From Swiss-Prot:
Species in which this protein is naturally found: Caenorhabditis elegans
Biological process annotations from GO: negative regulation of Notch signaling pathway; Notch signaling pathway; regulation of protein deneddylation
UniProt keyword list: Developmental protein, Notch signaling pathway
Disruption phenotype: Partially penetrant phenotypes when temperature elevated to 25 degrees Celsius which include embryonic lethality, reduced brood size, egg retention and an increased incidence of males.
Name the record gives this protein: Suppressor of aph-1
Length: 245
């Protein structure tokens, strides 16, 4: 930035620089140049100039003259900055940049920005809110996934019902003997449902019906099967041929 005249407004300096491919880039504002410098894209060997001067100078020349980088203070050009600093020292010697100053600032490493990178947009990357990947999830990653949203679906309920029906189906040999209704036990899921439908106990102050004791007897009729049926049942149970004489 620099002042336009003695009492003019402060104008932001625009910069041009030479990339590693010797191509000219710019103009860019001082805030953009400062962002790329802090990100590690620039070093002391960077060739740059303001829009107010025809010749390029290294970033190291600016840093040695000012004691820091030139992107956070009002500057017009390197020559104008030297003249301004000389005017502030009327009794001192004129400050001149040594001719061989550029050779003292060897780049420690190649500059890492690619030629095709849209440099003016870099300083906006941290100003556009959270990364796009954060919008793909409907909840924060720290929150656990709700298991109810995954297990209580129509497909899972149908699969559970099919498994219950398969477990409740009697063996084939009971069906062949007409005994499919004997020995059938309620499934665990049915026991839970039956337990849920048990009426709750009443309060102690609520009157109940008088208990009536009764004795009940029952007679179980025997199941008659033939030798052939018994032989087939035993063969299926033992896994080998059984012959009843």
């Amino acid at each position: 930035m620099h002042k336009n005249g003695n009492n003019g407004p402060v104008i932001d300096t625009k910069w041009h620089y030479l990339g590693p491919d010797s191509e000219k880039y710019g103009p860019y504002m001082s805030k953009d140049m400062l962002f790329w410098l802090q990100a590690g894209y620039f070093n002391d060997g960077l060739q740059l100039k303001t829009e107010n001067e025809p010749n390029y100078h290294t970033l190291g020349e600016w840093s040695q003259l000012l004691g820091t980088h030139p992107f956070s203070m009002p500057v017009h050009s390197l020559d104008a900055t030297i003249a301004q600093m000389n005017s502030m020292r009327p009794h001192g010697a004129m400050m001149m940049v040594p001719p061989g100053l550029q050779n003292q600032f060897q780049p420690p490493m190649p500059m890492r920005f690619p030629p095709f990178l849209p440099m003016p947009l870099l300083h906006q990357m941290n100003q556009n809110g959270p990364p796009m990947g954060a919008q793909m999830h409907s909840q924060p990653p720290s929150e656990p996934i709700d298991a109810g949203s995954l297990s209580h679906t129509p497909d899972s309920e149908n699969e559970t019902r099919l498994n219950e029906q398969t477990l409740q189906q009697p063996p084939s040999w009971l069906i062949a003997l007409g005994l499919a209704g004997h020995g059938r036990k309620p499934h665990h899921h049915q026991q839970i449902l039956a337990h849920q439908h048990i009426p709750q106990m009443q309060h102690a102050n609520v009157a109940t019906d008088q208990v009536v004791m009764k004795s009940v007897e029952c007679q179980t009729e025997p199941v008659e099967i033939s030798k052939e049926q018994a032989s087939r049942v035993l063969s299926e149970l033992l896994g080998q041929m059984v012959i009843i004489n």
